[in-house]
């Protein structure tokens, strides 16, 4: 499930995944093409354990002192991997910076090597990032070794499930040591995803929408709207398209949902909010 040196499973010596090792980090999506991956020192240690995280977890990472490893869930982390939508690219003389957001937050990613493979990256597409957490002038950013475009949207969903599983592993272990009750699925605050965390949030939305008898496609769009960060402007149709993936006629679905009075436009015809978010 986790990877040592971008390939070997294992978040740590005591992590026994409920998933098969071959599923680690979306390995089912053939992401580990060794010919295109950066070389990594294979020594064991926190700095060489690749951990799946959300951007919120990165931004909330802590250090004991300036030279210490960053910690997430009280555990030292070195290399991290996350997925998100590439919002901005800024090429400079010595490096290229990318602004990436995943619904839990936004972070700057810096890449110092000019690799031809990165030229295929485009804004408003999902990417996977590998790198290390750094801080400069009080601002956390990611020093990236590798960034690639995500071609199978299932990888996005799998990543968040994996991040939840690892988060629960470490937090449940800590609670057990401290004699506290092990948490169920209350992971939304730590991970930043209010609607990915539990049966509760998802089921609550489904219960509220039950009276509308929505199709699976319409329900998928509603879930995407509620999963996006809640703002006064709502969610842009472009972000919705990225979230729901291909195969859904987004125009037809949003038109229907507007006619039913379930969603409405805000600052322009491309931004939508759910009426349930106002309740």
Curated annotation (Swiss-Prot):
Residues 80-140 bind DNA. Phosphorylated in a cell cycle-dependent manner. Hypophosphorylated in G1, becomes phosphorylated at the G1/S boundary, it is maintained in this state through the M phase. One of its GO terms (biological process) is double-strand break repair via homologous recombination. It is found in: Nucleus. Its main location: nucleus. Keywords: DNA replication, DNA-binding, Nucleus, Phosphoprotein. Residues 26-47 are annotated as: Disordered. GO terms for cellular component: chromosome, telomeric region; cytosol; DNA replication factor A complex; nucleus; RNA polymerase I complex; site of double-strand break. GO terms for molecular function: telomeric DNA binding. Binds to single-stranded sequences. Heterotrimer of 68, 30, and 12 kDa chains. This is Replication factor A protein 2.
């Amino acid at each position: 499930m986790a990877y040592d040196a971008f390939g070997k499973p294992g978040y740590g010596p005591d992590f026994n995944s409920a998933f098969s090792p071959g599923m680690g980090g979306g390995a089912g999506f053939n992401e580990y093409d060794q010919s295109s991956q950066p070389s990594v020192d294979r020594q064991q240690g926190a700095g060489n354990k690749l951990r799946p995280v959300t951007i919120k977890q990165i931004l909330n990472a802590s250090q004991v002192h300036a030279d210490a490893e960053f910690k997430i869930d009280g555990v030292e982390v070195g290399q991290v991997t996350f997925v998100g939508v590439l919002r901005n690219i800024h090429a400079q003389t010595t490096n290229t910076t990318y602004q990436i957001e995943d619904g839990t937050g936004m972070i700057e990613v810096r890449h110092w090597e000019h690799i031809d493979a990165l030229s295929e990256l485009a804004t408003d597409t999902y990417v996977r990032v590998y790198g290390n957490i750094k801080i400069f002038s009080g601002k956390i950013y990611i020093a990236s070794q590798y960034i690639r475009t995500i071609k199978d949207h299932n990888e996005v969903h799998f990543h968040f499930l994996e991040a939840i599983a690892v988060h629960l592993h470490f937090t449940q272990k800590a609670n057990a040591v401290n004699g506290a009750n092990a948490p169920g699925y209350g992971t939304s605050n730590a991970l930043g995803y209010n609607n990915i965390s539990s049966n509760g949030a998802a089921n609550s939305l489904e219960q509220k929408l039950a009276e509308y008898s929505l199709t699976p496609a319409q329900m998928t769009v509603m879930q995407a709207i509620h999963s996006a960060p809640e703002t006064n402007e709502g969610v842009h149709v472009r972000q919705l398209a990225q979230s729901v993936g291909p195969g859904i006629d987004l125009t037809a679905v949003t038109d229907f949902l507007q006619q039913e009075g379930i969603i409405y436009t805000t600052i322009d015809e491309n931004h939508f909010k759910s009426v349930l978010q106002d309740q």
